[in-house]
């Protein structure tokens, strides 16, 4: 019996058989300006010759799965002959869903997986639980860890003790990658070029040039300097999708510091945007979101737990999700948490080698466990007991 592991994120789906490798595939559909009538699904994005003005159709809104028609089409594509050629008669699935997911969404998920696709057994689980499983497998002497999952829609901070989540201490910050990209679009549109329709391009700009500042005010001073002294400034060459397929940063020695470029390329000059955008993860109040930043929320979450457990959480802080890939992210989280923590506690912040696929790898490990059969709901169970058995078994 094969097991398919699907970390069904709001932006990317991480999918693969438990005995094989993982693929990271957009969990959405696209329409392009040039081919208006055709809808592209998942990794058909690569077929679009001119992705400028790309229009996204997402199954998730504000972190929850609400558009089932789109999700079905993406799954049909992923499970179908183009991709994974799933033989449902002989396949189990491990699938992730958000924390505190609405029961109506959970019921729809059961119906679609069991009744439409007819998987043999299903395990629905939070992505953080898979990450925690992976972490405990790598660190068998540890009993506790706190998972910081900073994804597309939200950032969740979730303490796990012996693989059970501590619901009373979960914190959600309403800042994720989508908000950062949108904020960068607004800043660039206000200061330089109108890019409000260019989500795809600006998302790439964000990933290529943004970083987390270790000293915000010092970097702000550097960003004000003129010419050579301004080490923060970069010139980003935007793609035109004929000769330049993907944007890139001009090498420092080729930058024209005063005057215009002769090459005819379209250039974005970025200075304080590079670190002011990721700063929102640490100070959401900068843009009027009255919430704690990530380091404060980690400390607040741990302080909601019994005192004798707290030191174990401080020394097992695990970062997952796409936003943790900003250069400097781990160091900043460490230094701020260290400042807020009693001196006699050790603080350790772990950034896995691939924080995007970390929870998928946890799912792969769970599928190889001896007790895997006790965790899943089989089709026979579901046909006999319906949604109730899923509610009992799955701790969402």
Curated annotation (Swiss-Prot):
> Could you provide one GO biological process annotation from this protein's UniProt record?
negative regulation of transcription by RNA polymerase I
Q: Tell me how this protein assembles.
A: Interacts with CBX1 and CBX3.
According to its UniProt record, which protein family does this protein belong to?
A: Belongs to the actin family. ARP6 subfamily.
Query: What GO CC annotations are associated with the protein?
Result: cytoplasm; cytoskeleton; nucleolus; nucleus; Swr1 complex
Q: What's the protein called, per UniProt?
A: Actin-related protein 6
Work out whether the entry's keyword set contains NADP: no
Where is this protein found? Cytoplasm, Cytoskeleton; Nucleus; Nucleus, Nucleolus
> What SMART domains has UniProt attached to this entry?
ACTIN (SM00268)
* Swiss-Prot/TrEMBL keywords: Activator, Cytoplasm, Cytoskeleton, Nucleus, Repressor, Transcription, Transcription regulation
The gene coding this protein: ACTR6
The entry lists its GO molecular-function terms as: nucleosome binding
**Has UniProt tagged this entry with the keyword Transcription?**
yes
Q: List the disulfide bonds.
A: none
Q: Which Pfam families match?
A: Actin
Q: What does this protein do?
A: Required for formation and/or maintenance of the proper nucleolar structure and function. Plays a dual role in the regulation of ribosomal DNA (rDNA) transcription. In the presence of high glucose, it maintains active rDNA transcription through H2A.Z deposition and under glucose starvation, is required for the repression of rDNA transcription, and this function may be independent of H2A.Z.
Domain of life (superkingdom)? Eukaryota
